[in-house]
């Protein structure tokens, strides 16, 4: 998949293994039912004034005949490049052939550049050949670090929002949308921090992607998803790179212009033990 399965700082702390991978690109195809769910949940009805919006909240009932289905897709490594000084490697990822045959608009290629720095790692994700389609889709960059200790060693997953840092993603009132968080546009990000050892932390800063989703749920239209049970840091989190699921005067074809068929997202990983 191109994800990192070994990441350590020092001899004592390992942040990744085969069951806890970081920096995994995931393309998600959505079913017709999922495409309709946002409209049902948002419950917005302007009386049918505009023909593209039905009272049921579905963008287009004709999608039901497309065979659209819900699935998480992971790319595979096609080629690996390395700088002569060994400071960076570039992973060239290709999509599954089955995904392409379904007619979704997944990027034709994804490049992930990993660059080691003195106290951090820079990650550059670039995709090429993104096709504009009406089929419901979303793209994610997932991080599921290995959190040391059992569940009694409480970990906190926090985010940086505009004007305030380190907001606990589990401390959200009911019906407030705990499933999706906006980030501060200036070096905002997310941090996994040990409750018993606050100096032990894994942080990912996002320079371009402004939305993150905690836990395993990626149904971002279900703003009540964590009302009964908050997201668990052990389940990781992901940055939302793009989505066309919204029916609130939001662009449903992406890319809207051909120049955006190539997109770039930058991240910085910092780990403290």
Predicted region positions:
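C-terminal (or distal) subdomains of carbohydrate-active enzymes
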Residues: 1-273
